[in-house]
């Protein structure tokens, strides 16, 4: 994942996820690069649901309201 993909994964989770993944998205946005990758490695379902391949991620990145 590129740094941009990682950023948008956390932004997408912080907006569209349930409360736990919203908190993880916010934590990821505040984290340093090493801890961002640790969060994503610990929660692969977060990447699957809100990562670059997801429609939500692509919508957020395109700036289209979902």
Tell me what each language-model feature is.
Residues 22-56:
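Short, charge-rich amphipathic interface segments used for partner binding and complex assembly
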């Amino acid at each position: 994942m590129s740094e941009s993909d990682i950023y948008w994964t956390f932004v997408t989770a912080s907006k569209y996820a349930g409360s736990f993944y919203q908190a993880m998205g916010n934590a990821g946005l505040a984290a340093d690069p090493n801890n961002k990758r640790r969060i994503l490695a610990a929660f692969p379902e977060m990447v699957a649901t809100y990562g670059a391949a997801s429609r939500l991620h692509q919508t957020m990145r395109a700036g289209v309201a979902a």
